[in-house]
């Protein structure tokens, strides 16, 4: 895949070695890049080291866009969306939303099991 070659080039450059080392040791890492480059960096990291990855985007629309972009790099089957609830899910008046609940459970189960997938949620 193209992302494998791009990921190898990125690793060879050493530009993100410090950030990757922090992430590998369980620490937080901050990388200042343009918002358009963020899905690529997540995809490159995932391609180099597939593991359970959680990304939090600012809003549902941004999360959908991020998930589609990462999916274009690593394959849609390796990206899951953790959709936000529409309204109050505990309200007695709330209509049943089995698809939404199913997608949420699939994403949460994937994270809990440590399956190699990129889960994209919104804040």
Task: Locate the predicted segments by residue.
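ASCE RecA-like P-loop NTPase motor cores
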Residues: 1-123
């Amino acid at each position: 895949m193209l992302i494998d070659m791009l990921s190898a080039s990125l690793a060879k450059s050493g530009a993100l070695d410090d950030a990757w080392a922090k992430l590998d040791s369980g620490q937080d890492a901050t990388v200042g890049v343009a918002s358009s480059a963020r899905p690529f960096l997540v995809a490159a990291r995932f391609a180099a080291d597939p593991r359970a990855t959680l990304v939090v985007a600012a809003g549902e629309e941004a999360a959908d866009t991020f998930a589609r972009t990462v999916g274009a790099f690593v394959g849609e089957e390796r990206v899951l969306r953790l959709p936000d609830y529409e309204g109050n899910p505990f309200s007695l008046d709330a209509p049943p939303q089995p698809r939404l609940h199913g997608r949420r459970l699939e994403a949460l189960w994937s994270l809990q099991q440590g399956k190699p997938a990129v889960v994209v949620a919104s804040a």
